[in-house]
Every structure is written in C-alpha cells, then in structure tokens.
Amino acid sequence: MRIAFASEDKLGLEGQVSMHFGRCPFYTFLEVENGVVKNWQVMENPYFGNHVPGKVPEFIHSQKADVMIAGGMGPRAIEFFDGYGIEAVTGAFGKIKDVLQAYLRGELRGAGACHHDHPESCRHE
C-alpha cells in the first residue's frame, strides 16, 4: 500500500503532518507492507503557491497513492480523490510515524470536509 501524507517538512517519518493538504510544501509517500514501512520518499508540492483545483489530487494519483492523509481538506478535493479511488483521510496531526500507526490501527478513517470558518490563512481545496 502506498500512503501519501501532506507534510510540513522533509523529515520523512519524523516529519509533521500538514493541516492543509493542498497548500502544504511537501508530500511524504510511504510504501507499507504488512504494517511495516519498506520505503519512503519526500516530494515537493508542485503546486505550492500556485493553487489550481484538482491538480494536487491528480499529482497524488500520478504517484500511485492508495491513501491520502492530511489534517484537513475541502469537499471538492475529497470528491477528486474519490474519483481516483484514493481513500482521503482527515483529522491527522503530529508526527507522520505516529499518524501512520493510528491509521494502521483503524483509528483514522474516511474524510470529513472542513466546515469551520475560514480566515485568510485557512483555505482548502
């Protein structure tokens, strides 16, 4: 299984999950087999600072992810991921390695679109 994480940094498993999936600077991709991380890779968000709706889900799909985990994402992004057959998971925070374990234990499932008031700094897909 290939799991993508919205990331604040390039620290891999020690990195922090980003609260805003489409506007994070990096994505961390993990190859997980039988609950064990076999490989990981950090890639820059090619649309960081140049938001185009639907392009980030397309990028994540092109990287062959099965799951996308982030702190939050908007309903349109969730629809794009659904269309690609990628499980969108929200509500994640903290270190990627800890969030991965929570996901594998079944503590994080499905996506809930963000419905809080959006100040200028909080914009979702």
Show the residue positions of the predicted features:
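Short Gly/Thr/Asp-enriched flexible loops that form oxyanion-binding sites at enzyme active sites
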Residues: 78-84
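Non-catalytic interface/targeting segments
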Residues: 1-51, 55, 59-62, 83, ...
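Short active-site oxyanion
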Residues: 64-67, 86-87
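Short, well-ordered alpha-helical microsegments
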Residues: 77-78, 96
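Short His-Asn-centered micro-motif
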Residues: 70-71
